[in-house]
């Protein structure tokens, strides 16, 4: 069963994918997708906020991908994998109300639904590295 937030993330991913692949304006894509897939007011706010934040911070998110998936140039990742990572890394770093494990699980589920055969495993590995690095940084600050 698809949760309400999972469906919202699917819509965010679709908008990011279409913007990345075809250069369409993400907000215009969202408006079309939300006409086709009506959401609660709360989800609409979540969808626009998350999409706009990922678009705004794309370069920084890509730097994180380069750091934690150094064997894979960002430009060579599939459009789906690249945007699942952008979305999840943003949530892990900036969305304090979303537990890290939930953000990783949601990203893996998106990868299973929309990505290639090895996407879920790849996404899980990269995001686990991001999570570990953040935990290590937090532990260093506490010491």
UniProtKB/Swiss-Prot annotation:
One of its GO terms (cellular component) is cytosol. Keywords: RNA-binding, Transcription, Transcription antitermination, Transcription regulation. The keyword Metal-binding does not apply. InterPro entries: NusB-like_sf, NusB_fam, NusB_RsmB_TIM44. Transmembrane segments: none annotated. GO terms for molecular function: RNA binding. GO terms for biological process: DNA-templated transcription termination; transcription antitermination. Pfam families: NusB. NCBIfam families: nusB (TIGR01951). Involved in transcription antitermination. Required for transcription of ribosomal RNA (rRNA) genes. Binds specifically to the boxA antiterminator sequence of the ribosomal RNA (rrn) operons. Belongs to the NusB family. This is Transcription antitermination protein NusB.
């Amino acid at each position: 069963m698809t949760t309400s937030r999972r469906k919202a993330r699917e819509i965010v991913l679709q908008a990011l994918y279409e913007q990345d692949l075809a250069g369409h304006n993400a907000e215009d894509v969202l408006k079309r997708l939300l006409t086709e897939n009506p959401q609660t007011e709360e989800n609409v706010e979540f969808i626009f906020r998350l999409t706009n934040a990922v678009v705004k911070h794309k370069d920084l998110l890509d730097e994180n991908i380069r750091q934690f998936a150094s064997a894979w140039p960002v430009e060579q990742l599939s459009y789906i994998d690249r945007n699942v990572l952008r979305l999840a890394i943003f949530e892990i770093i900036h969305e304090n109300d979303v537990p890290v494990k939930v953000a990783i699980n949601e990203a893996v589920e998106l990868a299973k639904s929309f990505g290639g055969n090895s996407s879920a495993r790849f996404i899980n590995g990269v995001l686990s590295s991001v999570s570990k690095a953040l935990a290590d940084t937090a532990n260093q600050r506490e010491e």
